[in-house]
Structures are given as structure tokens and as C-alpha cells.
């Protein structure tokens, strides 16, 4: 590999060409980042950067001569294709420094002036082409402070929208919080040791970035204030440190202040229903268990008409609310949108109001991200055109909201849509109806906006009459009937004469280009006119660029109202999508109460019911008198689906959505836990059973009477007795100590005796029936325990060979004839005295120790070396040990 020269000062650069000296200085500034070095129509990379980029992007690796006596490896990409290459590099976890030409090549005596204008990292993407439309890509920073009582401060910024949040938690909760936020990049101090799983990119910055005084000063300077009291973060010192470091890093990547970041939102621990990473995965909120994006709860509900709405819906699903008031505000807004609901019925008629609202939302682009790019001065001309058209569509949207005035939240959102009329008028006057893709192409500023630009454009483009007249005069003057006056980008304007007519060319014709069948000439008159036209084109483009910068300056004052408008549009879109789904699929508004309770009548799994022809609805009741359901039944009977169904209905209710049921009542929940299925964590060195116990331990440690807990087949990864003992003990602990609302599925039928001892537990089962053709799963939840598990019948349906099925059936009959082993049945007998249990365990331990000692004595005996007398003595000693 060719290493980049590291010394960038003094004599170390003397042997390099001036251009390479400039490159090496900029590369030293970029550090380990890939440096895209602008040279004309290409971004070039040299030395290790070239070799790395060639490998990652499959580019051709060439050489750019020698500098300081050594060859220079080089690879490049076209400027117009930069975004697609950037996307590939960011997807690979790379960060890129982009160096642009900012000087005038014509005026430069040496290398044209260049500087790094921005840094692109996985967490600082703002370009539309690099961002996922329906998901956020946040940049996060973490800081752990305190030794006796450590606290983890977490800050995260969505640079593409300007949303800036902070929170604090215990260090043990940090991994769960990061999973909730799902940042693309995490910033941490160089010396920080964070032992946690994180799939995104990690970036280390100097420790002093996280120092309290410097971080606070960074925030105060950015928000132009003397105190952080107005942001409600004064009691979050660790979060303030993280926020200051994050803001410093983000501003450096953009090479400018972040004008669209205008506030900090402090999140408190009691704000949301907490979902740990296992629960988010098991409930398949936005990703299936196999890692696919569909079918998930999000893909099912996402009927949003704007990308902003889709992103907000995703955030709502990952952040269900704990308090009822904001949930009821959303729910009431959805109900108001469904004004065509027929009284006393569970179905919805066609809602013309809702369709009108959703049609109006179709007219809106991603204003949230456009506003951010306006602030960052990276907005493209066509985005401004789409913003202009969107502002023109606001009155129609306002009109469609008038019937929703009965909803306080809808009224608030309608008021938030109001925009100053000046911005719409400015964009309508300034931006061409169909602008070019980039400002460098011209044609962006509308005709009539600037008289000087109009004059330059006329001079540059209205030369058609002159060329026609010149061609006619030259034909008459030379007698060459097929003479033509034309233009191309390489040679400019020229007069073309065929080879057979060149003897008629006048003396004032100067040859410009020779072709196979023609010669091309220039005359003094045509040259003078060409200079004037090309100069006008250059001046026109320069004027247009200047006007575009002035336009961005004028738009900067509207970033805040644009962001507020985008936020209102996103929420209206999300509410309308949820309302439309409720209307189409017979969902109902759940009743929200203060106590911890879940009461569902004829509930349905929102995703599964759309995937099968007929879904069997089931109810569920969990409250103060019925805190645990012990669920038994056959494999494939629907236990896991039923449990997920209950959790998803509860989660939907806490987001403000309607739910798939005929009636539902859901109380205030603080957490939702799931332990449904498991797989080996090979990378972490943990078996399935270890994973299962780790998840169970987390649930037992953190669940409360306001938690919903789903436990599926706990204890199955070990021996029967161990598994049964653990399952019983875990269920008993959840019921009597944690007192969480629990769905506990099991194949250990001994556990069905628990309700006899603890009245707040109840047995239910998934029904099945046997027929001549085998087992039939009814998928109905019925009261009471199951009578059997039908494991052999399920194996038969799975295609296990008939001989194996017959042998298994015979073995089952033999085991059933023997009856259940006494120790297993008696293991949890309520009348069993605790002292007897303790004595039995002590005796077992003593027996085990004696057997171990006996084994050691036997191993120590070498029969070949013993005399008959010694052998007889050894035998007596062993007999004495046994008796």
C-alpha cells in the first residue's frame, strides 16, 4: 500500500508539486476520513485513499505521475455521480470529507483555492439521495458521569430535520435506550469504555469535548442564550455534556452553524411505555424476526401520503405513551376524522372527509428535510420548486380541515400550518417553473425576477437572428452555397465549408478545425460576437448563482415556521393513515383508564389477520383479580400469536390508534416485556437457554404491577425437572412479587395447578380437536387448562416418518401407563413442608459428596500393583465407606 506523506509543513513538502502540497495539507486536515478532492469534473483520491476507494467502490486504480520521487496512486469519480458513490461508502460505515474548488481557476496563479466544505458520516446525512425516506438517521453522543452514582447522558440529533433530544438513564439502561433511538452513528470520548452492543458506526472525539463547562458554553453560544433553564435540562448534567459534544461535532461536519437546530427536547423516564430491544424484535414493530421490512406492524399501518408522516408513525410505534391525556388527544382526532361512522355499529361507512384530507396531503413533499437543507444552504432548485407548489396547496388543505374543528388537537395542527405569505410569494417570483437540477446548469431563477439577469440571458441566447444573417451574408460573399454557421461546446462558433469549396474561402477566414470532409473557420466578426456571447453566458451563470445565494439568505428566516408546518403535516398525515386503516378494517377506539388493566373482546392480531383468509378472534382479561393467564395447548395452536396479539393491541392503544377488536379497555402501562422464542447468541458465547434466562432475569428485575409481561415456554432449554422448577418459580415470582400483568404459555401441565394456590392466576388453553384426518387447530382461547399437547400429531403433520410416529406413540402409551413420576408431581405440592424440602436437598448434597469421594478412591487404585493382601484391604475400605 502507498502511504500518504504525513509531514505537511516546511521542507517535507518541498519535493512535491504545488498541487500535491495543497492536497497533503487538506488530507492532514481530513485525518482518517476519505478525502474527495475536486479537480474539474471529478473528485480524485490519492495514495491510501485511492487504494481504499478502489477496493470499496470497484474503481480503476491508476497513477498520477510522481511527486517527491514516488508514484501517486489515483482513483476518481465523476462529480455528477458523487451521491451514488457516497451512499455506497456510508452504507459500508465510511466517512468522507468533501473538498471543493472555491477559487476562480482563471484567476489562480497556482493551484486553484480549495477547502473542505463538509464531512459526510453515517449520522450526518442530509442529502435526499442518501437518506431513507421513511426512517430517521440520528447522530448520538453518550457521556457517563459520576463514580458513586454514575449516570449516562444521551443526546441525539436528526440533522435532516433539526430535532434535538436529550435524556439520562442508568448506565445499565444505555444499550436499551440506544436500541430505542437507533442512531446511525455514536460519538464517545476517546477514553470512554462502553461495553455494549451497538450496530452503528462509532466515532471517538477528544475527551475535552465532553467537559461540562465547554459543553455548556457550546450550547449557550448556539442557542444565543445565557441559561439552559428554558430547555428543562438543568438537572441533566451528563446529558448536557453529551449534547455539547454532539453539537460541536455536527457543526464541524457541516462547516457552519446549524441554524435549523433551534431547541432541545428533554425526555423523562416516565414519558413512554418502555420497550427493550427483545420486545421490539419479538413484536416485529418495524422489522421481522428474519430482518425484513415487511410484514410488520409499521408496513401494515403505513398508508401515509408523505415521508414525514411515515417517519412519525414509525416513531409513535416505538414510543407508546404512558399518560392518557396525549393519547386521548390523538384518539379523538382520529375519531373526528371518521365522522361517517354509523351510530351503534362496529363498521365504518365511506368517509368522504377523510379521502379529501388524504388527497390534499398528496401535494406535499418532504418539507421537514427541505427546511433543514435550506438552513444548511444545500437545498436544490427543484426542492425549492416543490416547496413553492406545496405552499400554494396549503389553502386547499386548510379547507379540508374545517370539519375537524371538534377535535382540539386538529385545531392546534391547523393553526400550526399557517405560513407567512411572504415566503410563498418570494418563491413564486424567484424560482423558475421547471428549474434545472443544479444551480451550475442555469435556468433556476425565474424570468422577470432580476432585470440584469434577463439582459445577460437575452445577450447569451438571442443570437439566432445574428447567426442566420451572418450565414446568408457569407454565402453571398463567398459564393459557397452550402456554407453553415454552427456551434459546439468544444470549439465554440465556427463556419463550416466542405472540402470541395475550400478554394473559395476568403483571406480573413482562420482555420479552427479540420475534419475528414470539411474545414471549420472563424472570422474576426464571428470571434468578436462569440466572445460577447460566451462572456454573457458566464456572467449570466455567475449572476444566477449570486441570486440563488441571496434567495437562501432570504429563506433562512422562514426555517422555523417551515419546520412547524412540516411537523403539523406529519401528524395530520399519520392520524389520517390510522383513521383510514380503522375505517377499512373495523378497528375500534379503546377505552383508556388509569389503572393497570387489559380487557379485550374479540381481539385480532393486526398483521396476521391480513395474511390469512379467516382469523379467529379471541378475548383477554387481565386486571387486579386476574393478573396471570397460564396458557396451555398444542404446538401450532396459536399461543404465541395470541400473546403477541394482546401486546400489540395494548401498544396500539397507547399510541392513540384504534385497535383490532370489538371492544377494548387498556390501562396505563409502564413497560412491555416479551420472552417469546430464542436463538443462540454465538458471537456472545451464550446458548439458547442462557439467552432465555438472561431475558427472564431482566423481566424479574424490572417488571412492576403496571407492566405487561409475555413469557413463552420458559425453561424448555434444559432438563425436564430443571425447566419445570424454573418455570414454576418464575411464574410464582411474577405473580406474587412483581405482580405484573402476565401471559405465561407453557407445556408443563404441572403449572396449571398454580391457580389453585394463587387465585389471581387463571388457566386458559388454545382449543384443538381430533378427527379421522388428524388434529384440527381451532385457535380459540377457552377457559381452563388443556388436556394434552398433541405433540405427536403435530410431528406427523410436519412429515416425520410414519415409523418414528408409531414408535413415539407406543412410547407415549408406555409412559402414560406408568403414570407421572412421583417426584415431578409432588415437586410443588402446596402442603409440602419447607423443612422436608430443605432436608431432602441436604441429603442429596451429602450423597453426591460421598459418591464423589468413592469415585476418587477407585480411580487411585492400581490393581496391577497391589498384592492380594493389599487388594483385600482396599475392598474392605470401600465396603466400609458404603455402609
UniProtKB/Swiss-Prot annotation:
A GO biological process held by the record: mismatch repair
GO MF assignments: ATP binding; ATP-dependent DNA damage sensor activity; damaged DNA binding; mismatched DNA binding
Keywords on record: ATP-binding, DNA damage, DNA repair, DNA-binding, Nucleotide-binding
Keyword DNA damage assigned: yes
InterPro entries in the record: DNA_mismatch_repair_MutS, DNA_mismatch_repair_MutS-lik_N, DNA_mismatch_repair_MutS/MSH, DNA_mismatch_repair_MutS_C, DNA_mismatch_repair_MutS_clamp, DNA_mismatch_repair_MutS_core, DNA_mismatch_repair_MutS_N, DNA_mismatch_repair_MutS_sf
A GO-annotated cellular component: cytosol
Superkingdom of source: Bacteria
Binding positions for ATP per the UniProt entry: 633-640
SMART domains: MUTSac (SM00534), MUTSd (SM00533)
The keyword DNA damage is assigned to this record: yes
UniProt cross-references to CDD domains, sorted A to Z: ABC_MutS1
Stored SUPFAM superfamilies: DNA repair protein MutS, domain I, DNA repair protein MutS, domain II, DNA repair protein MutS, domain III, P-loop containing nucleoside triphosphate hydrolases
Listed HAMAP family: MutS
Similarity comment: family membership: Belongs to the DNA mismatch repair MutS family.
Function, in words: This protein is involved in the repair of mismatches in DNA. It is possible that it carries out the mismatch recognition step. This protein has a weak ATPase activity.
NCBIfam families: mutS1, PRK05399.1
Protein name: DNA mismatch repair protein MutS
Organism: Bordetella pertussis (strain Tohama I / ATCC BAA-589 / NCTC 13251)
Higher taxonomy: Bacteria, Pseudomonadati, Pseudomonadota, Betaproteobacteria, Burkholderiales
Amino acid at each position: 500500500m502507498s502511504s500518504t506523506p504525513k509531514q505537511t509543513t516546511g521542507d517535507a513538502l518541498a519535493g512535491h508539486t504545488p498541487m500535491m502540497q495543497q492536497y497533503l495539507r487538506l488530507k492532514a486536515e481530513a485525518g482518517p476520513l476519505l478525502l474527495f478532492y475536486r479537480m474539474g469534473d471529478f473528485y480524485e483520491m490519492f495514495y491510501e485513499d485511492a487504494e481504499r476507494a478502489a477496493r470499496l467502490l470497484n474503481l480503476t486504480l491508476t497513477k498520477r505521475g510522481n511527486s517527491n520521487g514516488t508514484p501517486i496512486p489515483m482513483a476518481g469519480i465523476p462529480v455528477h455521480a458523487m451521491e451514488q458513490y457516497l451512499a455506497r461508502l456510508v452504507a459500508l460505515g465510511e466517512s468522507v470529507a468533501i473538498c471543493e474548488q472555491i477559487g476562480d481557476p482563471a484567476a489562480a496563479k497556482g493551484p486553484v483555492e480549495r477547502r473542505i466544505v463538509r464531512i459526510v458520516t453515517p449520522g450526518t446525512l442530509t442529502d435526499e439521495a442518501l437518506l431513507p425516506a421513511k426512517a430517521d438517521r440520528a447522530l448520538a453522543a453518550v457521556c457517563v458521569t459520576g463514580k458513586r452514582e454514575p449516570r449516562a447522558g444521551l443526546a441525539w440529533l436528526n440533522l435532516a430535520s433539526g430535532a434535538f433530544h436529550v435524556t439520562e438513564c442508568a448506565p445499565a439502561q444505555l444499550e436499551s435506550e440506544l436500541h430505542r433511538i437507533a442512531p446511525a452513528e455514536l460519538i464517545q470520548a476517546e477514553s470512554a469504555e462502553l461495553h455494549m452492543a451497538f450496530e452503528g458506526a462509532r466515532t471517538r472525539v477528544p475527551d475535552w469535548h465532553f467537559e461540562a463547562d465547554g459543553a455548556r458554553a457550546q450550547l449557550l453560544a448556539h442557542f444565543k442564550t445565557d441559561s439552559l433553564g428554558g430547555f428543562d435540562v438543568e438537572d441533566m448534567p451528563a446529558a448536557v455534556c453529551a449534547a455539547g459534544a454532539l453539537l460541536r461535532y455536527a457543526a464541524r461536519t457541516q462547516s457552519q452553524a446549524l441554524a435549523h437546530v433551534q431547541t432541545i427536547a428533554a425526555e423523562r423516564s416516565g414519558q413512554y411505555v418502555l420497550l427493550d430491544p427483545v420486545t421490539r424484535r419479538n413484536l416485529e414493530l418495524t422489522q421481522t424476526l428474519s430482518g425484513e421490512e415487511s410484514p410488520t406492524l409499521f408496513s401494515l399501518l403505513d398508508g401515509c401520503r408523505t415521508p414525514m408522516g411515515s417517519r412519525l408513525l414509525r416513531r409513535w410505534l416505538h414510543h407508546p405513551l404512558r399518560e392518557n391525556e396525549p393519547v386521548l388527544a390523538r384518539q379523538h382526532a382520529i375519531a373526528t376524522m371518521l365522522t361517517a361512522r354509523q351510530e351503534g355499529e362496529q363498521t365504518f361507512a365511506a368517509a368522504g372527509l377523510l379521502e379529501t384530507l388524504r388527497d390534499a396531503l398528496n401535494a406535499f413533499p418532504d418539507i421537514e428535510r427541505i427546511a433543514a437543507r435550506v438552513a444548511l444552504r444545500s437545498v436544490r432548485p427543484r426542492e425549492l420548486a416543490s416547496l413553492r407548489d406545496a405552499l400554494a396547496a396549503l389553502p386547499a388543505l386548510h379547507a379540508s380541515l374545517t370539519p375537524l374543528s371538534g377535535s382540539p388537537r386538529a385545531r392546534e395542527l391547523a393553526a400550526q400550518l399557517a405560513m407567512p405569505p411572504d415566503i410563498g410569494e418570494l418563491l413564486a417570483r424567484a424560482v423558475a417553473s421547471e428549474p434545472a437540477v443544479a444551480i451550475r446548469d442555469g435556468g433556476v431563477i425565474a424570468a422577470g425576477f432580476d432585470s440584469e439577469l434577463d439582459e445577460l440571458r437575452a445577450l447569451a441566447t438571442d443570437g439566432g437572428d445574428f447567426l442566420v444573417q451572418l450565414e446568408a451574408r457569407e454565402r453571398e460573399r463567398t459564393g459557397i452555397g452550402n456554407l453553415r454557421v454552427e456551434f459546439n461546446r468544444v470549439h465554440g462558433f465556427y463556419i463550416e465549408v466542405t472540402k470541395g469549396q475550400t478554394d473559395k474561402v476568403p483571406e480573413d477566414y482562420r482555420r479552427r478545425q479540420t475534419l475528414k470532409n470539411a474545414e471549420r473557420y472563424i472570422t474576426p466578426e464571428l470571434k468578436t460576437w462569440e466572445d460577447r456571447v460566451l462572456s454573457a453566458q458566464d456572467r449570466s451563470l455567475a449572476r444566477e448563482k449570486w441570486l440563488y445565494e441571496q434567495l437562501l439568505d432570504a429563506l433562512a428566516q422562514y426555517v422555523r415556521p417551515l419546520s412547524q408546518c412540516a411537523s403539523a403535516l406529519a401528524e395530520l398525515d399519520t392520524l389520517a393513515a390510522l383513521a383510514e386503516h380503522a375505517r377499512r378494517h373495523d378497528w375500534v377506539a379503546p377505552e383508556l383508564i388509569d389503572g393497570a388493566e387489559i380487557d379485550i373482546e374479540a381481539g385480532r392480531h393486526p398483521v396476521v389477520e391480513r395474511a390469512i383468509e379467516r382469523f379467529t378472534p379471541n378475548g383477554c382479561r387481565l386486571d387486579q383479580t386476574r393478573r396471570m393467564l397460564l396458557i396451555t395447548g398444542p404446538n401450532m395452536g396459536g399461543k404465541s400469536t395470541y400473546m403477541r396479539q394482546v401486546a400489540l393491541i395494548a401498544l396500539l392503544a397507547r399510541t392513540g390508534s384504534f385497535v383490532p377488536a370489538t371492544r377494548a379497555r387498556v390501562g396505563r402501562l409502564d413497560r412491555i416485556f416479551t420472552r417469546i422464542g430464542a436463538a443462540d447468541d454465538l458471537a456472545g458465547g451464550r446458548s439458547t437457554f442462557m439467552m432465555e434466562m438472561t431475558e427472564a432475569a431482566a423481566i424479574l428485575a424490572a417488571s412492576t404491577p403496571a407492566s405487561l409481561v409475555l413469557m413463552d415456554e420458559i425453561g424448555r432449554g434444559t432438563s425436564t425437572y430443571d425447566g419445570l422448577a424454573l418455570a414454576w418459580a418464575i411464574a410464582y415470582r411474577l405473580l406474587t412479587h412483581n405482580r405484573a400483568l402476565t401471559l405465561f404459555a407453557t407445556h408443563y401441565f404441572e403449572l396449571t395447578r398454580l391457580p389453585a394456590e394463587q387465585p389471581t392466576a387463571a388457566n386458559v388453553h388454545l382449543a384443538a380437536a381430533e378427527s379421522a384426518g388428524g388434529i384440527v387447530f381451532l385457535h380459540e382461547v377457552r377457559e381452563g387448562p388443556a388436556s394434552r399437547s398433541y405433540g405427536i400429531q403435530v410431528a406427523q403433520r410436519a412429515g416425520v416418518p410414519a415409523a418414528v410416529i408409531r414408535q413415539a406413540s407406543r412410547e407415549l402409551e408406555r409412559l402414560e401407563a406408568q403414570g407421572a413420576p412421583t417426584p415431578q408431581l409432588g415437586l410443588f405440592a402446596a402442603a409440602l413442608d419447607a423443612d422436608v424440602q430443605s432436608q431432602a436437598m441436604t441429603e442429596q448434597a451429602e450423597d453426591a459428596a460421598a459418591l464423589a469421594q468413592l469415585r476418587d478412591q477407585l480411580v487411585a487404585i492400581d490393581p496391577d500393583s497391589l498384592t492380594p493382601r493389599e487388594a483385600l484391604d482396599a475392598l474392605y475400605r470401600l465396603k466400609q465407606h458404603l455402609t
